[in-house]
Amino acid sequence: MSGSLSRGNGGKKVLNKNQLLKRNRIRNARSIRAEAVAASSTKTGTPSDLSESGSKLNVDQFISSRQFEVKQLQLAMHNSKAASSTRIFQALPRKLRRRTASHNVRRIPKRMRNRALREMRKSDQQDVLKGSSASSRKAHGLNAKQLYKARMSIKLLRLASKSTSMKLSMPPEVTSSNCHVRQKIKTLKRMIKESSTANPNIKLLNNRMGSYDCTGVNELAPIPKGRVKYTKRQKHFAWLPTHIWNAKRSHMMKRWGYQMVWAPTQKCFKLTHRLGGDTCSSDGALCMDSSYIGTIIVKDKSNDSEGDFLKSIIGKLTAERANLRKYREGQVLFQGLIYSFNEENGEDSTKPLGPCDVFWVQKDTAIIRLHPSIYTQVFNILLQHKEKLTVQDCRYSLASVTLKGAKALESLASCLRSTEYSKSFEQFKMVSMITDHNALPQRCTFAFEAIDPRHLAAPKKLNDSQRKTVNSDDILSLHENYPQDEINAVFNELCDPESRTQSYNNQNTLKEISARRYKLLTATPNSINKTTVPFKESDDPSIPLVIIRRLKTRDWIVVLPWFWLLPLWHLLNRIPRMYHIGLRQFQQIQYENKQLYFPDDYPFTQLGYIENSFYKKEASKTKWDRKPMGKRINFEKIKDIHNTKLPAYSGEIGDFFSSDWRFLQILRNGIDYLQRNDKTLELMDSKKTGQFNAQGVRDINCVNDVLEFCKDYEAKTKAMSLSIEENIPVALCKNRKCQFRTPDSISVNSSSFSLTFFPRCIIAVSCTLLERGHPKDNARIYQVPEKDLEHWLQLAKGVYRPNGRKDHDLKIPLPEVHDLIGFITSGTYHLNCGNGMGIGFIDHHAAIRQPTRYVLIRNVGTNTYRLGEWSKISV
């Protein structure tokens, strides 16, 4: 029959449909279009390259024709290369590319493996060939190959000990007693027996995925057990649920007991600004795995349903701010500072630890979300009252995703489906069409039972029949028709370890879900939805899921059981215009929204002070030391920094690589001490003959003495190796009247070391530069001197040249060293404002004395001052 077909086609091979398509594609790709040169334009109607006489060349027309042909040649070369070469590995878009681009050849069909190996060698890609497959290995004990070797070894040992011919063939020193044959046989038998019998200590799970609830009740929970292959890597730093996915696409960092995402490998500074900034410029969303934020669930054991004892504890932790009616009864998420207290020592809530989120589920139940650096400290504080409270450590049992952007809710709605009719889910579907989240009420929380996100073959938007325009009445109904009972029921399931364990019951594997989807695809009726696996209430698990709005940071968090996060994460990142971010991008968003980022912008806390004075300082100093002598700044030889040069310091003041809050504390306390009783402030004392009094204590009579004392304290700290965690030099000012004692009352006979005993009250500010330049981290903030105020006010209005342009080359007056009032903790160019902007802290006493809100900002290692205007940031 094949012969007849060949004869009918002239002896040529009959090509199938795919071969014909490929041949036509290559033929079209290799065809090059060209413009024909016409001698006259009358016949063709097109402009000719030649003149009417035919002897001259139209240069313009000739160049345009050749330009067209060169472009067609380049296009044909590109198309021909792409059409004729078929790669085994896909050329993915940049967003989906992995960092290392390594491939496992075993996952490729056998007929393509040799070609894949050639491609990988050509492109210097890593191949995975060594190692055995884990699919054939049993759950416990030996695999089939090891079991066969053990049984064969027993038979050979028995044969060698009984066979006379084998004994004679062996050397005389090799005997059964010398080789301990019996002991080896017993050991092999024991190994086979242990492999065949099940371990009675193993707790059987309710699913085949290995998911379980890892909660510590009144104790810290252990790191969740995953694959044995990765256990050793998580000994000190636990992995988040999305670690393997993120490790291929992001730069990771190890801090605070976790391996977290620092930043994606792709450049995303402007992208983060557009999507995470204003709603008008956002056409997508950003997502971040925020499971490193630890979750504590606190319940009041007392029979009182009002939870008065829990209310008192939360009040002490948050300075009574989280106990307001809006948060406790209205179910609005509280974002603020958390404080440490110890009732035994009689300490009050004056030492802030860091930021926290508090959500009141009911009056006797609260959820506290904390940064991992302060999690253990707060957990131990709550554990002191375990007789009256039940404290659950849910660090590894509750996961969360943070979403930000105009399309955050719309993207989330395309991945989630409710198991049954839910009023909260209906409200969520209606709200998902709103891009401006500022139009929503403050109490905007959704909770419902969701199906497995893997039931959806791909993220699918809601049907047009389900979508309708949202008006003001619909938004008002969110507050009026708030389904509190329904939401409380889901929260109770989320806060119960047994309910979380039940959510993993019959959790399907990907293979099982694919088999169910294949049955749908091969079904006869076409009316059913063949891409979404239907939910079976009797067999399929349901996920208790909560979506909470955060007002301060203007984003959304999704809280769900730990092992359910990865399926949702995979589906979220398949949505167009959805990008994953890390801690670096979250800090950028906080900076652009003029919010503080923990711990970099919290120098008044213990961890923030350590971060600035140790980690960031050492990193900057190491980077500076690596530079050659000719490429690094010599901070000690910088000239013209201040108006008056004092003998105590030459060049840059304070620490060169950090915000020297200790220097600011001593300087401001010393100035207040020198100006006590309306005394005149002197920079130097020319009549002074000695530096120390009869008791060997340095006399403080002028500003130069204060600077000399700073050097003395620094030398003493290095000699005694004092801990930097103790005696934080600054404290956040809560009220207008500072609560800390000022050094105005220091007696003359007291030690000058009292200047370090009183912390300075500081306030958080955002400083926006009015002209050129942008501040950097650790930049110095100076107050505007009274004598130069007119000059800087004129500069703020603008000094123009005769041609109408601004004059930026004016000679500016320099401030004195005692005009230093603060530091910039985070500073760069603000894309939204179009100017340089920095977040920092200034001395509260100096701020309230200023007639204007203008300050001078100078970067470290420079002598250029920029005028800026500060505004207070509420903490």
From Swiss-Prot:
A Gene Ontology molecular function term of the record: ribonuclease P activity
Subunit field text: Component of nuclear RNase P and RNase MRP complexes. RNase P consists of an RNA moiety and at least 9 protein subunits including POP1, POP3, POP4, POP5, POP6, POP7, POP8, RPP1 and RPR2. RNase MRP complex consists of an RNA moiety and at least 10 protein subunits including POP1, POP3, POP4, POP5, POP6, POP7, POP8, RMP1, RPP1 and SNM1, many of which are shared with the RNase P complex.
The reaction(s) this protein catalyses: Endonucleolytic cleavage of RNA, removing 5'-extranucleotides from tRNA precursor
Entry's localization field: Cytoplasm; Nucleus
Highest taxon above the source species: Eukaryota
E.C. code: 3.1.26.5
Keywords (A to Z) from UniProt: Cytoplasm, Hydrolase, Nucleus, Phosphoprotein, rRNA processing, tRNA processing
Region (Disordered): 1-20, 35-54, 119-140
Bias (Polar residues): 39-54
Keyword RNA-binding: no
Protein name as annotated: Ribonucleases P/MRP protein subunit POP1
Other noteworthy facts: Present with 846 molecules/cell in log phase SD medium.
Primary role: Required for processing of 5.8S rRNA (short form) at site A3 and for 5' and 3' processing of pre-tRNA.
An individual GO BP term: maturation of 5.8S rRNA
Major place of residence: cytoplasm
Pfam families in UniProt: POP1_C, POP1_N, POPLD
Modified residues (Phosphothreonine): 524
InterPro entries: Pop1 (IPR039182), POP1_C (IPR055079), Pop1_N (IPR009723), POPLD_dom (IPR012590)
GO CC annotation: cytoplasm; nucleolar ribonuclease P complex; ribonuclease MRP complex; telomerase holoenzyme complex
